[in-house]
Amino acid sequence: MKIEAITGSEAEAFHRMGSQASHRYDEFVDLLVGAGIADGQTVVDLCCGSGELEVILSSRFPSLNLVGVDLSEDMVRIAREYAAEQGKALEFRHGDAQLLAGMEDLAGKADLVVSRNAFHRLTRLPAAFDTMLRLAKPGGAVLNCSFIHPSDFDESGFRAWVTFLNQRPWDSEMQIVWALAHHYAPRLDDYREALAQAARETPVSEQRVWIDDQGYGVPTVKCFARRAAA
């Protein structure tokens, strides 16, 4: 069982957690810097949730052209409201990361296409990576960070996961949601094959998939690729 859209009270709960723990985005922002993010670029965030990353990036890189896309209309609404509260004029759209529909105007134009802690919820992982690569311009990069199945953790990673699960300041419902997100998450090899499959349709000059716990405290999978130059 996988739920693609986060709606209602669950969407509100995810926003509360994200807005109260902005430091947990530091690692991902560092990865974006390593991928070459810079002012003036176009950046598309698939499965953007309630917009915390967009607010953070727009503060650090004021002239970014940011577009957040999420399947949940509730998340898009929350993201727009949150950005306005923070004094940010940001664009958020309703759309499915597994389809290019609604994002055709961005195809081949993004310097960087990103997604954070969301692809483990999707039912068509290769299609999501295909969307990322099709949105990227030639020479542009894609970067995804997602949960992995606990069977891919080593002993220290599993201990870190249990500690994180027990120590987060959330209610029992969100604790269960977070645990189930890992239970239904893809394996490391699933991510590798999904990215490789997408790269067969849209050629890349480099691709890499790895696991680490840098910054977040729990092992996550990182998937990076750069679309081949024209």
Swiss-Prot record:
GO molecular function term, any single one: 8-demethylnovobiocic acid C8-methyltransferase activity
Q: Known EC number(s)?
A: 2.1.1.284
Q: Name one GO biological process term.
A: novobiocin biosynthetic process
Name its pathway: Antibiotic biosynthesis; novobiocin biosynthesis
The first-level EC class reads transferase
Family the UniProt entry places it in:
Belongs to the methyltransferase superfamily.
> What's this protein's name?
8-demethylnovobiocic acid C(8)-methyltransferase
Query: In UniProt terms, what function does this protein have?
Result: C-methyltransferase that methylates 8-demethylnovobiocic acid to produce novobiocic acid in the novobiocin biosynthesis pathway. Novobiocin is an aminocoumarin family antibiotic that targets bacterial DNA gyrases.
**What is the catalytic activity of this protein?**
8-desmethylnovobiocic acid + S-adenosyl-L-methionine = novobiocic acid + S-adenosyl-L-homocysteine + H(+)
- What Gene3D superfamilies would the database entry show? Vaccinia Virus protein VP39
Q: Which UniProt keywords apply?
A: Antibiotic biosynthesis, Methyltransferase, S-adenosyl-L-methionine, Transferase
Does the keyword Methyltransferase belong to this entry? yes
